[in-house]
Regions:
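Juxtamembrane helix-loop transition segments at the membrane interface in multi-pass membrane proteins
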Residues: 2-7, 12-27, 57, 64, ...
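N-terminal membrane topogenic signal
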Residues: 25-38
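Membrane-interfacial loop-to-helix junctions in multi-pass transporters
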Residues: 33, 128-133, 263
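Structural signature of hydrophobic alpha-helical transmembrane segments
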Residues: 33-36, 56-68, 262
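Hydrophobic core segments of alpha-helical transmembrane domains in multi-pass membrane transport
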Residues: 39-50, 70-75, 95-97, 137-147, ...
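Hydrophobic transmembrane alpha-helical segments of multi-pass transport and channel proteins
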Residues: 99, 143, 147, 254-266
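Transmembrane alpha-helical segments and their cytosolic interface motifs
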Residues: 199-229
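Conserved structured catalytic cores and adjacent interaction surfaces
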Residues: 219-223, 228, 256, 260-262, ...
């Protein structure tokens, strides 16, 4: 294609496939990896609004448990906290996903009196025919997660963030001294400065992410109480069940739902504690 050339010269021919428009700042390319996180968050929000069939809910609950196990294994295999620098974002998405599942299971428990095979299996296995046993086991798991692991991990993250920020000026001065003495070159100095900045950002993010885990533990307790009390009200007043039958049915589903949500939450809390204590 003919285009106008410089002043005093003839027309030039543009090569095939060459863009004739002026080159500006290129827009960032949208890749599958970049779209995975927004798509996951949108899917979780949709899951909170739209009722899910029991088959899909069983699949998502199993996926939640498997993801928590994988996160725990990944946190145990890192040697430094920065080796898993995306852990705060991963923690946020996992917590949001678990809360979305809690909303979906609560809708099924109160609306239809069932919540799929996974929750029923967990409730039957742990309770062993006794409502008291199931509730006691659930409360023990909540106490372990909330009082022991979550509070400890939150405190470690707070102290780590504070000491990392306090130590930054001294580390920067040490890098400058090594650079001026010729011990390291410019590339190594840049790498060390970047690592220090990344470490401060990581512990600051983990400080906030630990608060999310703590709030998730509180939300789990509240949701369990809502499921139990709301199930009794729905069973007795709307479905006409006897108090004993309503207690047996909805306590089984409530304990199963609580265990299915608390076991992944416990695993991720342990992962958080392992990461911040590296």
């Amino acid at each position: 294609m003919l285009t106008a050339g410089p002043e005093g010269s003839g027309p030039t021919v543009a090569k095939d496939g060459e863009d004739e428009s002026p080159k500006g700042n290129p827009l960032p390319r949208t890749t599958t990896a970049n779209m995975a996180l927004p798509a996951a968050v949108v899917g979780i929000v949709v899951m909170m609004v739209i009722p899910l069939p029991t088959t899909l809910l069983d699949l998502l609950l199993s996926l939640n448990i498997a993801a928590a196990v994988l996160i725990l294994l990944a946190s145990m295999n890192v040697t430094r906290a920065l080796d898993l620098a995306s852990f705060p974002s991963l923690l946020l998405v996992a917590t949001l996903f678990r809360l979305g599942l809690n909303v979906s299971t609560t809708r099924l428990i109160l609306g239809e009196g069932e919540a799929g095979g996974v929750i029923t299996a967990f409730g039957s296995f742990v309770m062993g025919g006794s409502v008291v046993v199931g509730l006691v086991v659930f409360l023990i798991l909540v106490v372990i997660q909330f009082v022991v692991i979550t509070n400890g991990a939150t405190r470690v993250a707070e102290v780590g963030a504070r000491f990392t920020l306090d130590a930054m000026p001294g580390k920067q001065m040490a890098i400058d001294a090594d650079l001026n003495a010729g011990i390291i070159d410019d590339a190594e100095a840049t790498r060390r400065r970047t690592e220090i900045s990344s470490e401060a950002d990581f512990y600051g993010a983990m400080d906030g992410a630990s608060k999310i885990v703590k709030g998730d533990a509180i939300a789990g307790i509240v949701i369990t109480l809502i499921n139990l009390d709301g199930g009794l009200i729905v069973g007795v007043l709307q479905q006409g069940l006897a108090i004993g039958d309503a207690t047996s049915t909805y306590s089984l589903l409530t304990v199963g739902d609580g265990l299915v949500s608390q076991i992944p939450a416990l695993l991720i809390s342990i992962s958080s504690g392992i990461i911040v204590t590296r």
